[in-house]
Amino acid sequence: GSEMCIRDRDYPYALHQKGGWLNPDSSDWFVDYAKVVVDALSDRVTYWMTINEPQVFIGCGYAIGKFAPFQKLPARDLAQMSHNVLLAHGKTVKMIRECAKKAPKIGFAFSTPCTTPTDNSPLAIEIARQKSFAFTRERFAFETAWWADPIFLGDYPQDAYSVLKSDMPNIKEGDMELISQPVDFYGVNIYYSQAEENPVSYTHLRAHETVL
């Protein structure tokens, strides 16, 4: 049978002009679009990917300005856009389970940063692990835990609250329950890894519980 990724990178320009992922209604726009796809194709599709690589279209498109729409937005806007993307995912999972014509398998895919140990020593391995999952203000839109924790653990990582502070998104009652709708699989795209050349600089990082 067919397998469907509902959303990868492109975004309708008419909706971009209305604020895009910053618009509070953006998650509902997405569900409306996804419903059209489900109504048309769910009789022949089992595996559904709601959203692919939000780190790419949010991080590269709105944080560092390398992809369309080539913007560099402040942390507060990036956090709210991320939250709306996650809401779109959760609402779409719920809609697919309610409306699909055949039993669906639903997931979400990330583009995951990865650091490789410089050698096989326990210290180098731990340094690489902590670098891979470190949460920083400058790179939070690319961090795995920022996207995965709300879906699998029902909340943003604790580091996010201490790092972003007042720039955390507006989280309404019921949002996290929607975002953390059960999924059937978890997609991971790892395109490359990098070795940590200065491990001493990361020895101060505390352990972080991750979903991986």
Residue ranges and their predicted role:
Residues 7-206:
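Active-site region of glycoside hydrolase catalytic domains
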